[in-house]
Amino acid sequence: MARKNQKAPWEPEEEYILVSKSEMKRDMDALQKLGEELVELKPSVLAKFPISEELLDAIKDAQRFKNEARRRQLQYIGKVMRQEDPEPIQAALDKIRNKHSQNTAVLHKLETLRERIVEQGDSAIDDVVALYPDADRQRLRQLARMATKEKQANKPPKAYREIFQILKQLNDDAVSDSIENELKQ
């Protein structure tokens, strides 16, 4: 019988967390899939990730390989990733995906604005000038009239595209100005 101040021999001193073999395999597969996503990235983007040199070299090798060698290299990347913390890597990857979806949303917003300019004319142009004070009202009116005429004459939508390019430039300028203002503060 154990004494009062001692633990019984059948009571473990530390609490063990038992992980099933299938759960370990799922975790390893998830790391390998994360590695596959890293292999698909461009080297310039990959350089910004918080990964070790060994993993970076393995990813660069996998980008060169084809077929079976690539599959084996991806398994090796999964093995190397087991020694690294996947959280910051996943966070950086999510940030890149989010940035892409934000850019797509901005482009859709600009396309909608272009449609309004062509269809509604001056009222939509007034909204654009309110959003972007640097906008050239006269040039936008001229392009809106030209886009309408091109559409009626079944000509290529040159003015239509130019409106979009102007809106995109105005948006880019507004974003860069806001970034500069944040840096000054």
Curated annotation (Swiss-Prot):
Keywords: Cytoplasm, Ribosome biogenesis, RNA-binding, rRNA-binding. One of its GO terms (biological process) is assembly of large subunit precursor of preribosome. GO terms for cellular component: cytosol. The keyword Transport does not apply. InterPro entries: DarP (IPR006839), DarP_sf (IPR023153). GO terms for molecular function: ribosome binding; rRNA binding. It is found in: Cytoplasm. SUPFAM superfamilies: PSPTO4464-like. Belongs to the DarP family. Member of a network of 50S ribosomal subunit biogenesis factors which assembles along the 30S-50S interface, preventing incorrect 23S rRNA structures from forming. Promotes peptidyl transferase center (PTC) maturation. PANTHER family: UPF0307 PROTEIN YJGA. This is Dual-action ribosomal maturation protein DarP. It comes from Vibrio vulnificus (strain YJ016). The gene is darP.
